[in-house]
Amino acid sequence: MRIEEDIKLGFKDVLIRPKRSTLKSRSEVNLIRCFSFKYSTMKWFGIPLIAANMDTIGTFRMAEALSKFNILTAVHKYYSFDEWKNFISVSSKEILEHVIVSIGTSNLDFFKIKKIFSLSSELKYICIDVANGYSEHFVSFLKKIRSFFPDKIICAGNVVTGEMVEELILSGADIVKVGIGPGSVCTTRLKTGIGYPQLSAIIECADAAHGLNGQIISDGGCTVSGDIAKAFGGGADFVMLGGMFAGHTECLGEIIQEKSKKFMLFYGMSSTSAMKRYTGKIPGYRASEGKIVKIPFRGNVDVTVRDILGGLRSSCTYVGAQKLKELTKRTTFIRVSEQENCIFNNFKN
């Protein structure tokens, strides 16, 4: 047993210090980034936000909607091959170029990903997604995928420490997904006692990844656009969002009508609801590590996306970053004990 004495920080523990700026307007900020990758020879241009590969969020409809904003969608791994075949047959090149295909680490996943990628050359991204990226089996599977898909852009996770980021990049990952337990419907930290404050995980993992010409995705913990700015400020190359995209028309959550209001169910992928939906039961060796929540139905995702992008542009303006790429260099975090004035938080419109 050992104790690390240095303080680890989450998004709620800091604010970004404003700095002098030559920018006159938010409209001058460019959120588009261009990435090249360690293994894949492909390049990517776009806004580096990703809809999470949860079954209610990472849907085909979400991919169609977000592609219009040049934003990626990590499509969940529970669609059948026939559903993929139908989606690819009716989708444009622009949509498919913004799709990340998610898989697990079983032999069935390996056969399925080969079949899916045989359908279209426009698919570029693979996300090998497990809750715990620290297993030797996971690393071995990553090497297998890289060997079979030498030129695809591969992201793998989740992990939260620099040494494992380095291990995954050296094993074939272009991008490493960072985050254990920060999600809005994740209870892993409570159930297991395992985790890492997200901002510190980003800072440490980005340092490790960038030293090897890799990138990271910050996965989880963002509740407002200011948190997204903090993630980019801490060194994240991409930011993955689940809860912030929940409750929209493009999601697959069950809609509940209560009097005159609509709500949508949103749950974690290790929750009782998810396990029963895809395996029929909770395996005897497992415990639920997610929760189910009922959130107000929010309509089309377009409005939420514009609000997020507007907040991100404003963050860049406050620190004088004309490009999103410059935000990390322009960021100075200050530790705080409060984030907002809460006097009217209990008042409703």
Swiss-Prot record:
The keyword Metal-binding applies. GO terms for biological process: purine nucleotide metabolic process. It catalyses: IMP + NH4(+) + NADP(+) = GMP + NADPH + 2 H(+). It comes from the Bacteria. The active site is at residue 186. K(+) binds at residues 181, 183. One of its GO terms (molecular function) is metal ion binding. It is an enzyme of class 1 (oxidoreductase). GO terms for cellular component: cytosol; GMP reductase complex. Its EC number is 1.7.1.7. The keyword Oxidoreductase applies. Keywords: Metal-binding, NADP, Oxidoreductase, Potassium. NADP(+) binds at residues 108-131, 216-239. InterPro entries: Aldolase_TIM, GMP_reductase, GMPR, IMP_DH/GMP_Rdtase_CS, IMP_DH_GMPRt. Catalyzes the irreversible NADPH-dependent deamination of GMP to IMP. It functions in the conversion of nucleobase, nucleoside and nucleotide derivatives of G to A nucleotides, and in maintaining the intracellular balance of A and G nucleotides. Belongs to the IMPDH/GMPR family. GuaC type 1 subfamily. NCBIfam families: GMP_reduct_1, PRK05096.1. Homotetramer. This is GMP reductase. The gene is guaC.
